[in-house]
Every structure is written in structure tokens, then in C-alpha cells.
């Protein structure tokens, strides 16, 4: 086999290594939560990875960034800041919970299994079994976004409460003046002197 033929077969060989790893861990491709709330991602794996460490990290998931949260040994539950990983070997799943979400938590994450090569410090030679999750964070919960019915405006001419307001005090004299004038006019009209018509002699 020539050197050129070997170089041409190298990408195919790497693809064969990657495809099995990409299919051994599964879960949702997209999850959504609201700011201040929590969301959970359930990751399912094959039985052969039952005793392996499980991890959660943000893409591109570089170890030097120290943003990876990983179970270790017999620990079934690991917590780091707002991330909790709970392994359930009985049903071959592990759950990742993100608490107190912020807008900055939105992005792409990796839900994966730590291989032996990675545990031995040989990270990067073989791809870990994992799948990618898109985390979406909404600005507010649906309850906060609900439309509130505006209060009915009060009429300025109405007097509410047991004690009249200052507005009512101002309106009452204005209403009494025309009423008094009407009554006074009626009294004067009734009591006016009647003229006796002149009789012709």
C-alpha cells in the first residue's frame, strides 16, 4: 500500500471510529427553559458504558477550560455550581439538571461518556461517545408574560368611599347654585302681583 493510499483511507477509518461512538449515547437535540427556572436533560447510553464516568460540558468542550462536570467512581450524583448529574445505571440513563437558568446559559452542550483513554490522560485520540444538545433559554416564564387586564378607570364625577373627596366638595356647590336659582325663580313667578284688567265703562 502506497503512502498516498494510506492517507486516503485515514479519514474513512476515523469515520468508522466516530460513528459507533456517536450512536451509543442518545437524547433530545433541543431543550428549553426560562430564566430563573430549571431544566433537565436525560441521556441514554449502552450497557457497556454502565460503569464509565458520565459528563456534561459546553461546546467545544475543551478540558483546559475546566467547564466539564463529570461523575467519578461510585458517585451517582455530582453537583457543580448550577449543574447536577445523576447517574441511573439501573435504566442506563443519566440526568443533567441546570438550575437557576440565565440568558448566558443558552448554547450547545455535550452529553457524553468518558472513555478509558480519556481517563488515562490520552484525551483526543479517540472520540468519546456523546451527543449534542441545544439549550434555549427564554427571557421570562409564561406566567410572567400573561396579559393582565387593566383596571377600569374611575369616573371623576363619582364619589367613592364613606367620606366625600375634595372633588365632590367642589362639585356640590356648583350643582346647588342652579337648583336654588330655579326654586327662587319659581317662587317669584307664583307670588308675582296679578293685574286686574280694566273694565270698560
UniProtKB/Swiss-Prot annotation:
Intrachain S-S bonds = 43-111
Kindly list the residue ranges recorded as spanning the membrane. Answer: 169-189
Q: Which molecular function terms from Gene Ontology are attached?
A: transmembrane signaling receptor activity
Q: Which UniProt keywords apply?
A: Disulfide bond, Glycoprotein, Immunoglobulin domain, Membrane, Secreted, Signal, Transmembrane, Transmembrane helix
Q: Sites of glycosylation?
A: 100
The residue ranges for the Cytoplasmic side of the membrane come to 190-201
What tissues harbor this protein?
Expressed on CD16+ monocytes and myeloid dendritic cells (at protein level). By contrast, not detected in lymphocytes nor granulocytes (at protein level).
Extent of the signal sequence: 1-24
Example GO BP: regulation of innate immune response
Which residues are on the Extracellular side of the membrane?
A: 25-168
Source taxon at top rank: Eukaryota
| GO CC terms | extracellular region; plasma membrane
Give the Ig-like V-type domain ranges: 25-123
The record, for PANTHER family, names: POLYMERIC-IMMUNOGLOBULIN RECEPTOR (PTHR11860), PROTEIN CD300H (PTHR11860:SF117)
Q: What does this protein do?
A: May play an important role in innate immunity by mediating a signal for the production of a neutrophil chemoattractant.
Q: Belongs to which family? A: Belongs to the CD300 family.
How this chain assembles, per its entry, is:
Interacts with TYROBP and HCST.
Annotated protein name in UniProt: Protein CD300H
The primary gene name is CD300H
Amino acid at each position: 500500500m502506497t503512502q498516498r493510499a494510506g492517507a486516503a483511507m485515514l479519514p474513512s477509518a476515523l469515520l468508522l471510529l466516530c460513528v459507533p461512538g456517536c450512536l451509543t449515547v442518545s437524547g433530545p437535540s433541543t431543550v428549553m427553559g426560562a430564566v430563573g427556572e430549571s431544566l433537565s436533560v436525560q441521556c441514554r447510553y449502552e450497557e457497556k458504558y454502565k460503569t464509565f464516568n458520565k459528563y456534561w460540558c459546553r461546546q467545544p468542550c475543551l478540558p483546559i477550560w475546566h467547564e466539564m462536570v463529570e461523575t467519578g467512581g461510585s458517585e451517582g450524583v455530582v453537583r457543580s455550581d448550577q449543574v447536577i448529574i445523576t447517574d441511573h445505571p439501573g435504566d442506563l440513563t443519566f440526568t443533567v439538571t441546570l438550575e437557576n437558568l440565565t440568558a448566558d446559559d443558552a448554547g450547545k452542550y455535550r452529553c457524553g461518556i468518558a472513555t478509558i483513554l480519556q481517563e488515562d490522560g490520552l484525551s483526543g485520540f479517540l472520540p468519546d461517545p456523546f451527543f449534542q444538545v441545544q439549550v434555549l433559554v427564554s427571557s421570562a416564564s409564561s406566567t410572567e408574560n400573561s396579559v393582565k387586564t387593566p383596571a377600569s378607570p374611575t369616573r371623576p364625577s363619582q364619589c367613592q368611599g364613606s367620606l366625600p373627596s375634595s372633588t365632590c366638595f367642589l362639585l356640590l356647590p356648583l350643582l346647588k347654585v342652579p337648583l336654588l336659582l330655579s326654586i327662587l325663580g319659581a317662587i317669584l313667578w307664583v307670588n308675582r302681583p296679578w293685574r286686574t284688567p280694566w273694565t270698560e265703562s
